[in-house]
């Protein structure tokens, strides 16, 4: 769904997905765990206020060559001037940079995060997929902030199959057709394995 700052135009379409969102699950306060080089990690970030409660998703993946280096980003969605744009943004650095006030994933913009550790991960594949997606056209059901994050996770680690990233409505991959709030907080709990708790950011 479009990011919180853009609540006009196509972002209002996200309200059509609100009915799909169930009551929010209890969250556990936690801090990110340090991972040694060689282990991978993928994380969803969730803003529950965007799109009338349907939510907006950001993403991050860990560089397996370094103990504390990530790339992260978001597909902020279309604007009135660019009604089909993905609104792609990307950055990199340590977790403290990711969570800094000036970050595109700053805690002031997102409410929760949820991560999964992977045995390995290819950050170059993730970056390549991001660049491809950045040139595509936004679609509310099949090509948005949530599905884009899922595509990047799949490119990063072949282990991120439907067992970990369940399909959405009508078998759409990466939660297509479902709201980010419902998918990240609820469906990853009831229909997926390997995910950590929903942490307040």
What kind of region is each of these model predictions?
Residues 1-36:
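Secretory targeting and sorting signals
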Residues 9, 16, 32, 65, ...:
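N-terminal compositionally biased, intrinsically disordered segments and leader/signal-like regions
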Residues 19-24, 33-38, 107, 189-201:
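Extracellular cell-wall/glycan-interacting regions and their flexible linkers
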Residues 37-109:
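Glycine-rich catalytic cores of cysteine/serine-nucleophile enzymes that process amide/ester linkages
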Residues 47-49, 108-117, 131-140:
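Second-shell loop/turn segments in exported
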Residues 51-54, 116-123, 138-146:
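Solvent-exposed, acidic/flexible segments
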Residues 125-201:
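Activation targets extended, charge/polar-rich intrinsically disordered C-terminal tails
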